């Protein structure tokens, strides 16, 4: 079998490497990239040129993109699950991966962005995600076998991610969650941990090398109080040891990287230290500044207090991540999408309007960070692509 052990980001003792060398980088979320490919291949929709989007990302110096590598709603799972339709689904995935290879942009592939999709498709309740014998689990394992097996040899796949912010559902009492036994209880952390172990092991059976993360948000600052009370007590705020426990909940073996979206900056140093103690990598999968609609930075910070606040908050975030030595960060978001089939090419942050980056300070800030990493031997992406394409 072809050796793919040097492809993508690897994590050892909490350190990210690319092509055998320590790696640090700042990329973007391109949430709808596969959705746009499915629109084109399955539905014949040519309103949006996905290649143009990816080409402009490359021209903007973006090294990688976090992508929903699946479908969002259960009503679209049939595009892959029904065998007679799978060839078209593969064609759309092939298109995305080939474009990433062509323009030398790595993919953080989020396999099950919306955990409900496969449950809704087969009629399972959400607690059954931790049951290895449930119908939805078996279907997910088939998806892992198919997709991870198909693309493990591509240098465009930099990391596998299981989902998106599932931890925010844990111990919440206001979600209307009902178990498969008809019990009205919160969705529990133990379901999340069990689910990650099942999917993580399936990924590792096929790809023992690439970075593997759950895709979570930063822990709720009272997650331990919620955990101990099953959602009935909201105080006190987490201690350092409580945060350490939370990071372990969200990164059970064989996962090697903990994801934190929108972390409070006052806790970043602590999260970084805890990750090092646990020998896991830390990935800030989503962040953005204060939202202010100002396409192409038409108003300067001197002209607009709102623009100044947005730029100041964004730069403070990125500076904090860099000072804490975070290996990988991805800005939210390049291009937006209704999560159905309506293309909306406008975005409030690093968005696209016909492929034009709206907030230029974000592009420039990302380039500044990546240039720093490259100059200091922390991001030799050019060598990676030349060695592996």
Residue ranges with predicted function:
Residues 380, 387-388:
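Fungal extracellular Ser/Thr-rich, low-complexity intrinsically disordered regions
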Residues 2-255, 261-271, 277-280, 287, ...:
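Active-site mouth of glycoside hydrolases
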């Amino acid at each position: 079998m072809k050796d793919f052990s040097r492809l993508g980001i690897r994590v050892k003792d909490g350190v990210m490497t690319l092509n055998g060398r320590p790696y640090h980088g700042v990329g973007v979320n391109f949430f709808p990239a596969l959705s746009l490919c499915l629109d084109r291949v399955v539905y014949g929709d040519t309103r949006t040129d996905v290649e143009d989007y990816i080409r402009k990302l490359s021209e903007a110096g973006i090294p990688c993109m976090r992508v929903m590598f699946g479908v969002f709603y259960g009503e679209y799972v049939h595009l892959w699950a029904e065998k007679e339709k799978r060839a078209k689904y593969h064609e759309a995935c092939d298109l995305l991966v080939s474009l990433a290879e062509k323009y030398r942009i790595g993919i953080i592939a989020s396999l099950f962005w919306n955990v409900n999709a496969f449950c809704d498709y087969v009629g399972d309740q959400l607690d059954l995600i931790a049951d290895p014998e449930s119908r939805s689990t078996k279907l997910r394992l088939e998806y892992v076998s198919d997709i991870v097996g198909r693309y493990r040899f591509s240098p465009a796949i930099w990391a596998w991610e299981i989902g998106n912010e599932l931890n925010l559902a844990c111990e919440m009492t206001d979600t209307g969650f009902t178990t498969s036994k008809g019990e009205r209880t919160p969705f529990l952390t133990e379901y999340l941990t069990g689910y990650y172990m099942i999917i993580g092991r399936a990924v590792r059976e096929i790809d023992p090398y690439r970075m593997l993360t759950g895709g979570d948000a930063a822990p709720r600052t009272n997650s331990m109080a919620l955990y101990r009370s099953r959602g009935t007590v909201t105080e006190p705020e987490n201690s350092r040891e409580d945060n350490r426990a939370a990071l372990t909940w969200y990164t059970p073996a064989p996962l090697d990287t903990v994801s934190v979206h929108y972390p409070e900056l006052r806790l970043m140093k602590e999260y970084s230290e805890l990750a090092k103690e646990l020998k896991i990598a830390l990935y800030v999968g989503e962040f953005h500044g204060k939202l202010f609609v100002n396409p192409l930075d038409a108003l300067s910070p001197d002209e607009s207090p709102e623009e100044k606040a947005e730029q100041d908050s964004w730069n403070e975030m990125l500076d904090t991540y860099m000072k804490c030595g975070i290996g990988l960060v991805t800005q939210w978001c390049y291009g937006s999408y209704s999560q159905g089939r309506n293309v909306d090419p406008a975005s409030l942050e690093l968005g696209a309007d016909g492929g034009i980056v709206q907030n230029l300070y974000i592009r420039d800030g990302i380039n500044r960070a990546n240039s720093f990493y490259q100059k200091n031997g922390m991001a030799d992406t050019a060598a990676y692509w030349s060695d592996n394409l």
